[in-house]
């Protein structure tokens, strides 16, 4: 089975730029592995490729859900594997691009075959999370399965799902049998120095505010006043807090910058332990393009 290329790395490292530039030279189609780009209407805060860019370089799993719809890792896996197969069937090369490590890990390593979600149990767990706090519930999961606790990290949605499975079945998710991956993957992880990345994250956040992020979030809140999961994304959550009167605009920007830097740190930690066929490229943005093309030439003949 031929391998599928994966371009991963922390937020702001230039993955979208590299994919778009490659797509202008080579007949590739992007399969997005980004947990927020799946949502329609979340454009500025996700740095989503524009419709014009996506017309030049086809993208899959972008703008496929409304903000109130849920995207689980199982749903992502099914959609992504379907998209990859579709691209291959037309003689094109799929390029998986994204920074949602959990999605990329599911693609390349397979996914545990868990029972379907139970909304009632999940609702009770969300209430418990609000009352007891994330650390208390994470400690409960860690006692049963340190592996699951490491995997969910501080992601409340994944924590709720893991505890739901544990409490319903008595078995933590990591001990369920795993469905093998449908395809084989080779991964290139952008690994720029933090001194290079973090100032760019600050400038990107400021640019998003200048481009109209506040207006984008205001429109989403008018349509979805109950703050669905999609509006908990970095940037959207911080701006929503401002629009709901919790703090001023300047503090919203400061919170956004802190949140995106913290997210990038978590991505560095996650991708540092990426399994499988992985190469780390110690650059980002335009500086990484030559290394990216060399890697593609070596492994894929592009």
From Swiss-Prot:
Coiled coil: none
EC number(s) from the headed UniProt entry: 2.5.1.75
Binding site for ATP: 9-16
Record-linked InterPro entries: Dimethylallyltransferase, IPT, P-loop_NTPase
GO BP of this protein: tRNA modification
PANTHER family: TRNA DIMETHYLALLYLTRANSFERASE (PTHR11088:SF60)
Functional note: Catalyzes the transfer of a dimethylallyl group onto the adenine at position 37 in tRNAs that read codons beginning with uridine, leading to the formation of N6-(dimethylallyl)adenosine (i(6)A).
Protein name: tRNA dimethylallyltransferase
Species of the source: Thermus thermophilus (strain ATCC 27634 / DSM 579 / HB8)
Phylogenetic classification of the source organism: Bacteria, Thermotogati, Deinococcota, Deinococci, Thermales
UniProt gene name: miaA
